[in-house]
Amino acid sequence: MTRCAPFSILLLAANLVSAQALVVLPGTDDPNALHFNERFIARNHVASIVGQQLIKRDNRPMQEQKEKYLYRFDEQGRTIYSNNSFGQPGSGRDTASVIYTYNDQGQVTRRLRNDLAGHFAYTIERDSAGRTVRETYTRIENLGTDRYTLVPGATTEISDEHYTYTTVNDTTWRKRYLNNLNLPYREQTFVSDRRGYLLHIEDRYVITERRSRTTFSYDQNGRLAERVEQPDMDRPRKLRNLWHYDAAGNVISGELWHDERQVNQLEYLYEESSMLLKARLTKDMETGQINVVRYHTTLR
């Protein structure tokens, strides 16, 4: 007979998950990219977050940089707009902005990117399980005179990727990449344990047989603690990311190692009363330079 956990414990667990401003996820994405917790953003009525870049060099005062980051969220806590800019927004020096569109299941179906090269759209088609089966990358002509306001004109297709999925067994599945001849050229194999934790991803290019492998380890609370990437399995070089958390589950520090050499050290700071993200610090272990992004949150 299986005993149900007391409601108070379930409620505490749910609150701890919601209390985390950031989540660290296993997968193929950039491990150091910010992933905002949608439940936290929605519950705390966060409308936007602005980040200001600063640099601290040895024996020199902190210097504010022109680079800024902007994230906007809908009422469900989803990121609907992001921007990375130099100087004031609208000055013409913005490096990139992205508008996100979601389906009824809360999954991204389109990313509209605007940078100095123009407007580009990533359109994603999904199957009934929510998996990406097609991703089309197009350039959209802007008939308007304002770079930031798209008046759609001609569309030029740049790439059209298709994917298929195969279930190998209860804990293993495979993703295949198809080229324009509908032939597989790459495959990724995902292996989890029986509890659902992703253990490793093996990436193989069919023609060259080049393989890479990424493994994941977790702490006693099921949070991602280590990510080890071997970009080429014929060579011993490895990239290792480590993460540490506080009692509430907030990520508070991270490390990046290239083999036995530590490359950088990350720290995350939060507001004590609200647990809103306050700053992220990245120290280059070779030069000693510290890059700081200081965050300001606007509520609805």
What are these regions (language model features)?
Residues 1-7:
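Bacterial N-terminal signal peptides that target proteins for export
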Residues 14-18:
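N-terminal signal peptide c-region/cleavage motif recognized by signal peptidases
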Residues 20-300:
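Buried hydrophobic residues that stabilize the cores of well-folded domains
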